[in-house]
């Protein structure tokens, strides 16, 4: 198959946000695109599938401006996509990071300083202890705590967004194959091939399909297709609870932003990483923990364990007095696909010339979805910039995994 960069035939493996946004951008630039998803869309087992993912820029400290620029660009694209969706999926109640220290070199201070120096944005406020008590009385604030409040921040209804985006790209001509698991990838000098097992065929035989290029955006299942990369990624179990209460009126968007509580010790290391959302469409409040969970197989049972359930209940009752008599209506687990340094992988697979990898969301990838699609497509068309270089593999996969993020504060995706 002769490679014509003006119009290529490209397969995208995985219909999470990395895969669908890439398919959207490729189709918009005139390429022929097919998306293969091992389950339904949205896949209940995928990292992208949940009720909510935070949109925030106050978590990247002074690492560099790559992430801040990308999330601000992504926010504009989310709004553009939303205008084409049937349902509203983007909400901006603000974001709030609460911590116990605000001095130079502490994560909270450096996040604030970086954004002020680079954005000069009036939406970003520092709330002292008294202001925190007054502004958010539904939260029990400790006497040593202070916060960054960013009115710009918010969240995406992630599972709904994935569904809406799949409908949109399908209407534009992208071929979508649900319940079609890719079992293998091959390359020749002229083409790339997928071996696909489809439930719809009621057969154990594999179908071989030919493409110019393949984009592997299979998240936690990257190892199954590209073991030399996937074996370097850790898949961790992350847990959350959903809460009903007679006091839900105190937790609506107008009264409570997306929040996280990130106390640090004397070594500037995070002690705990709880976060949550205001009242969601489903009528519940979501509370979760962003500390890296246990490493699991992506196909394993994800039921929250008793220890998490107790810790979440204790945290909720301590920090949200109005929820003391509330009911936990459900609990669930999801997965993060973590790189050693928590930065994404957007690069050609090692030893491959026609297989590209978009993976390693590391618990903060969803918000960047629209920008990821553009970055991937730019590389496939040989139009690279600074951001593309930031996510190359290089020697990153040989590093030791971080227990906690070096991006600044933990960055809730849910």
Model-found features: residue ranges?
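N-terminal Rossmann-like FAD-binding beta1-loop-alpha1 element of flavoenzymes
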Residues: 8-35
């Amino acid at each position: 198959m002769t490679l014509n960069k003006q119009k290529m035939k490209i397969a995208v493996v995985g219909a999470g946000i990395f895969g669908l946004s890439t398919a959207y951008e490729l189709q918009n630039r005139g390429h022929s695109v097919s998306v293969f998803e091992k389950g339904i869309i949205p896949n209940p087992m995928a990292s992208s599938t949940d009720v909510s993912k935070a949109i925030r820029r106050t978590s990247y400290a002074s690492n560099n401006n790559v992430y801040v620029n990308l999330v601000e660009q992504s926010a504009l694209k989310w709004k553009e996509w939303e205008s084409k969706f049937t349902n509203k999926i983007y909400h901006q109640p603000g974001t709030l990071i609460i911590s116990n220290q605000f001095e130079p070199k502490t994560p909270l201070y450096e996040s604030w300083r970086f954004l002020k120096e680079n954005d000069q944005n009036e939406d970003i406020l520092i709330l002292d202890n008294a202001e925190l008590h007054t502004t958010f009385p539904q939260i029990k604030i400790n006497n040593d705590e202070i916060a960054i409040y960013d009115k710009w921040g918010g969240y995406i209804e992630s599972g709904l967004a994935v569904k809406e985006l799949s409908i949109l790209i399908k209407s534009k001509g992208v071929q979508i194959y649900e319940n079609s698991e890719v079992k293998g990838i091959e390359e020749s000098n002229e083409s790339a091939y997928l071996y696909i097992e489809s439930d719809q065929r009621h057969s154990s035989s594999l179908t071989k399909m030919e493409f110019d290029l393949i984009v592997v955006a299979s998240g936690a299942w990257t190892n199954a297709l590209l073991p030399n990369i996937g074996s370097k990624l850790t898949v961790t179990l992350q847990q959350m609870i959903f809460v009903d209460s007679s006091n839900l009126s105190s937790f609506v968007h107008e009264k409570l932003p997306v929040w996280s509580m990130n106390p640090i010790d004397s070594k500037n290391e995070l002690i705990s990483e709880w976060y949550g959302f205001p009242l969601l469409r489903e009528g519940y409040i979501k509370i979760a923990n962003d500390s890296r969970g246990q490493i699991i197989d992506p196909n394993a049972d994800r039921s929250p364990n008793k220890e998490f359930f107790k810790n979440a209940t204790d945290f909720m009752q301590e920090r949200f007095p109005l929820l003391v008599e509330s009911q936990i209506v459900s609990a669930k687990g999801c997965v993060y696909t973590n790189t050693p340094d928590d930065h994404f992988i957007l690069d050609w697979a090692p030893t491959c010339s026609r297989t590209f990898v978009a993976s390693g969301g590391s618990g903060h990838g969803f918000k960047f979805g629209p920008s990821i699609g553009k970055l991937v497509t730019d590389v496939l068309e040989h139009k690279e910039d600074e951001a593309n270089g930031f996510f190359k593999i290089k020697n990153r996969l040989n590093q030791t995994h971080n227990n906690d993020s070096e991006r600044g504060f933990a960055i809730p995706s849910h």
